[in-house]
Amino acid sequence: MEGEEMPEATWKPHGYATQGRLSTTEKDSLTTTAFAFPRTRKEPMTDATHVRDAMARFNQVKGVTDSERDLAFSNIKKAANHFGIQMKETDWRQFGTQRA
């Protein structure tokens, strides 16, 4: 993907932080801008813990295209920056290869 531009992130911070597991009702109430994968509403990112979870589970997400992974990576980068999380990865294909 070197030289290719990543899509613009769609993730936006929400007015609240949800610590811990989200209930189905809470997850259903989120807008698509809260998710790493907006179309499939996978990997909600409402706080730093959920952003780290999205990073850790990235390769486990099924039923998405490489273009959707590009967007999800952009969304994760934006959310990580917002919550003060440092990312070593510069491309989604690196997830799972640099973490100890």
Feature names for model-found ranges:
Residues E2-A100:
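A charge-rich, low-complexity, intrinsically flexible signal that marks solvent-exposed coils, linkers
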